Amino acid sequence: MKVNLLLQKSLLLFATVLSAHAQEKPVKVFILSGQSNMVGAGKVDGGGTRWGSEIIDPVVSVYGGTYNPKADYDALRPIKTLKLEFFGGTNPTPYPGGGVQVTRGFVQIKESGIYEFRPGYGGSSNCLMEVGGKEVHRQDPGGEAIRAEIKLEGGQKVPFKIIYFTKDANGLGWTARLDVPGSLKTLVKFGGKYPYLMNNKGQWTARDDVYYRGVVTATGSRWMGVQGGRIGPELGFGHSVGEAIDEPVLVLKTSQGNRSLGWDFLPPGSKQYEFEGKIYAGYKESPLSWNKGAEPKPIDWYAGKQYDDCFSAAHEVLDNFDTQFPHWKGRGYEIAGFAWWQGDKDRYNLAHAKKYEENLVHLITTLRSEFKAPNAKFVVATLGQTAKDSDDVNERLILDAQLAVDGTAKKYPGFKGNVGTVYTHPLSQGGASNSHYNGNSQTYMDVGLAMGEAMMKLLKGK
């Protein structure tokens, strides 16, 4: 018994020492960058749409007195009724007032699915709404809205009723489809995927060990979780590395849509070159290209402008680390890795596509040098629509370049064990990079998770 007790105390002390040691270590920073799909276009849900043509024959009835929860308003005689010519939208027909107001009518949804109803705005949200006899919304004055989802068949007319608890009553309201194919809410709530993103109350959760800081686009400063209507790969990436690393993690994303590596993100030190009778700009030169022998006429953009904008913004965050992240004040940080998902725009320009591999190699070495992180790992993700047997010349040039920098390809000995490429074609749920993979959040989550797993393999030397 004494031996077991001594062993338990020793294990507890060891765990405490390990925990304290992890707290003392610098924050692990991962810098994510790229174009629009790194920015993020994965749908979180279907969003709410204002009531409109789906509401049929709305009529408001007014009953004397104030709201009585014990009253059966279907059995009582109203003191007045009004057919509502306009219901929903932004300018519904005003209610007459003068008592308890109850609206009745029908709902006819176009597409079958699972829906949520959000009646009212401000004070008029204090009401009870039933659809098809089921209570779908209740908000008592001073309380929070309690809603229940309901499954509706497209084209079917279903009766609805709204009882307003106060004199604030109007025809404003919204409907949200909860099971939009490919949306994150559908995947989590109805598809059983990524259960760690939502609690048992159906609310999005946030990690307390991974912090998100977005600059340039997809801006934000918060603990990693779902916020807003779109996600990028940072959500899956953050979860993947957060689960594997003891120290706290900062995911610093700096990205911009519709940008090429051969022009907008061209790294410092890149030289101009000739291709098919044209001179293509080197870093800080303008325009993108000009005829050989002609005098270039600069425009209000230059080669590498987006590189400068994105990574100077990242520097600004890191240079003010204690101010930006007071919860980590005095702890310091270490840039552990970079993650890059880009290539769509380069595939529209043969010169850029042919130069992509050289530019990508230069990007990797330049970022490590610029951020004084020579040992930082680097993960590249390919374009989801491009298969290894694709016969599209430009897309294959981009894909082959991205695969070539992987350390296991052995083309660049200096990248062995520190650069990895994620082949995302098997992870794509359809669409293409230029259509943002149809907004399918599974693509964004799975690519992010895979990039995080690839990063951890590099960090662990596997």
Task: For the regions a language model picked out, list residue spans one by one.
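Cell-envelope and extracellular/periplasmic
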Residues: 23-72, 177-462
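Bacterial N-terminal signal peptides that target proteins for export
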Residues: 1-11
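Acidic/polar, compositionally biased interaction segments
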Residues: 54-182
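Hydrophobic h-region of N-terminal signal peptides that target proteins for export
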Residues: 12-22
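Conserved Rossmann-like nucleotide-binding pocket used by diverse enzymes
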Residues: 7, 18, 379
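A periodicity- and composition-biased signal for non-globular, repetitive helical segments
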Residues: 8, 14-15, 41
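A composition/secondary-structure signal for short, hydrophobic, low-basic-content segments
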Residues: 4, 17-19, 31
